[in-house]
């Protein structure tokens, strides 16, 4: 596995998130961390935003949020900076996120969901390879994918 770490986003590193950049055309697939950090503030009792680090360099961002009404974990705004794409960091980050969720930090659920635009071939393929399957539900132009942790 590619060596990355997840570090909680806090006052020491949130500004670094503003400098993350998507590849050409990817902004239609994922919100920039600025929006996600605003959501993290609003949902702070049920979520954890993470920086994806390669050594001491911020290479990406992802947020885990727990839906107490549906008793499910959601993965929001997964992104890897364009300079780090295609090198396995997204897969490694998702594996770390799933390990974090397996520790049940907010609630006792094994259900994980996320949404993905079907034409985001790289992300969709990654999620499928990690065991996610389409739930049959959608959110606007994105399909919901889900996974049940063992």
Predicted regions and their residues:
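Conserved active-site alpha-helix within GNAT-family acetyltransferase domains
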Residues: 91, 118-135
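Short, well-ordered alpha-helices that flank and scaffold nucleotide-derived cofactor binding pockets
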Residues: 95, 99, 103, 129
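Active-site acidic-Proline motif in GNAT/NAT acetyltransferases
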Residues: 81-87, 118-119
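Acetyl-CoA-dependent GNAT
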Residues: 8-77, 81-83, 100-106, 136-139
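Active-site beta-strand termini and strand-to-loop segments that position acidic
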Residues: 53-55, 147-150
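Conserved acetyl-CoA pyrophosphate-binding loop and the N-cap/start of the following alpha-helix
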Residues: 84, 88-96
